[in-house]
Amino acid sequence: MSPGQLSHAELLPDLTPVTYNDPMTHPLVLHPDRLFPADAGVRAIARALYAQVQKLPIISPHGHTDPAWFAYNEPFGDAVDLLLAPDHYLYRMLYSQGVSLDQLGVRTRQGAPVFEPREAWRLFASRYTLFRGTPSSVWLNQVFAEVFGLKVRLEADTADLYFDAIGAALKTAAFRPRALFEKFNIEVLATTESPTDTLEAHQAIRASGWQGRVISTYRPDPVVDPEHESFRDALVQFAALSGQDVYSWRGYLEAHRLRRAAFAALGTTATDHGHLTAATADLSDREAQALFTKIIAGQFTPAEAELFRAQMLTEMAKLSVDDGMVMQIHPGAFRNHNRKLFESHGRDKGADIPQPTDYVHALKPLLDRFGNHPRLRVIVFTLDETTYSRELAPLAGHYPVLKLGPAWWFHDSTEGLRRFREQTTETAGFYNTVGFNDDTRAFLSIPARHDVARRVDCGFLARLVAEHRLSEDEAAETAVDLAYKLPKQAYRL
């Protein structure tokens, strides 16, 4: 250990930030008023509201953590395996600055590259300044300070200290997945799986006797998008798991019904649909069968592929009316924009880009058929912030089936969460929204992400109190609803 460095024993037990005097390092300090309004009076109100929600259990109704973590409760590997590898927010920024994904250990289509985790972590630490002002630094600094008890900032000179301290912690029972789940005060956590998943991990969680509530979400994209590169292989698996002839229109729809029932038997309450657009359609049965025949034959145009996806959203709505699953629609991402990177590394490598998205016309066929149905609930998200006040808030402020999902992906920053409230509340109110989704693969960041959302909402509510638009007791009740009650209600948890 070099002079001035803290030992692991000194690093881990005490979570209170302290001044660290080594001239080569800087203290890591989380200010208790972070993210609250700058005005002292409004900040005091926000602080009081936050005290009402800070310790509430976490409801995580949509995300992408690995259910196998909780099924088998094996130790996490190292800092890279746990904090860097699952987080495409991090490697998209690093890639933008010329860092190769191979240097970070990101899997290619041929498998994991040969790399040294410590060197990857050193590289990340030396570029950590890139994340200043981003939500990633807010989340990670809270993880470093509150989960691992680290007391100095991550930078080149502290890279090894971090890597060793995190590695030592991950070898202890307190940092196993289930122990962290309980430490984080998570009441329910939803993962996301496709219809071709065997759900073995979720079955193992149920069989283990562990009391943590981890449920799946039904995401049928691989068997609904004929332009997905794995579509034909996915259909083979879909047929095997459902026992249906998925190459006939009736058998295909029945396979969805049966797989949804299998998910529901393990606690699933929601579906998710990550389509390029929000387009929906309401074809006659004859038209739908004719279109499906083209899709299965592989003889379709891009417009017909889009029409099929649109029809399938309406078919999913019909199934949700029957089985009660809440629909989530996450449209508007131009996926795999970097063709060369997609060819070498595959999907979900930080190369997805937001694009303009229409909702008023796109959703109308589905809403014409089901928009007033008492059993249907559809939660709509956007990457196109221009639609908040023009389209989404008015739609959710009218149709009983619609709710607004929170600021998503590129916009779940402090500023993005504020913009969402500022642009939707006047028309949709608070109670046509659904609280917060962390929507992450980065398990350790979940408490930090929810904490940021709670702080931002308390700051927004505090301003309404300061402007005498809400009383403080109304604001406190609303803060609790946004943090806890609304996500439970919206997702039927």
Predicted features, each with a name:
Residues 327-329:
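C-terminal amphipathic alpha-helical interaction region
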Residues 10, 14-20:
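Short, positively charged and aromatic/hydrophobic N-terminal segments
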